[in-house]
Amino acid sequence: MSVNMDELKHQVMINQFVLTAGCAADQAKQLLQAAHWQFETALSAFFQETNIPYSHHHQMMCTPANTPATPPNFPDALTMFSRLKASESFHSGGSSGSPMATSATSPPPHFPHATGSFATPSWPTAASPPGGPQHLQPQPPLWTPAPPSPTSDWPPLAPQQATSEPRAHPAMEAER
């Protein structure tokens, strides 16, 4: 039961090449033989699809099975996500009169007294009056969303995007 050690090494290399590249065993053997059994050279030749002479000329190099045909295009994916609207999953007609749908597309409130990036709410800083907070006068809201209008000028559109697609949310653009 004497097994040629070189033949055994070659068979192991062929099997490893098949697992790594995802190609057929006969193609792996041809690539390894052409690269003088240098594994990395044969693997590089396989992924670069260089012209290596084959004994069967009708045989084409196969695409590796463990890689996608085309990698994902992340800017396109971000563009698609920016086109999504929160109201679309609940209302088929797009934007409705609900405050939630309107606040998603309305400009943020402007607080002239704010000094930082966050506005301080106008809550009383002193202790509650006797009897508890139920006797406080209701404060008028600082900002009320405007009703939706078909000719709304918010969000502003870039000139080249005015007819093709809506502009992404500013927070989404900051992450790009």
Swiss-Prot record:
It comes from the Eukaryota. Residues 166-176 have a biased composition (Basic and acidic residues). Residues 88-105, 120-137 have a biased composition (Low complexity). InterPro entries: UBA-like_sf, UBA_8, UBALD1/2. Residues 88-176 are annotated as: Disordered. Residues 138-150 have a biased composition (Pro residues). CDD domains: UBA_F100B_like. PANTHER family: UBA-LIKE DOMAIN-CONTAINING PROTEIN 1, UBA-LIKE DOMAIN-CONTAINING PROTEIN 2. Belongs to the UBALD family. This is UBA-like domain-containing protein 1.
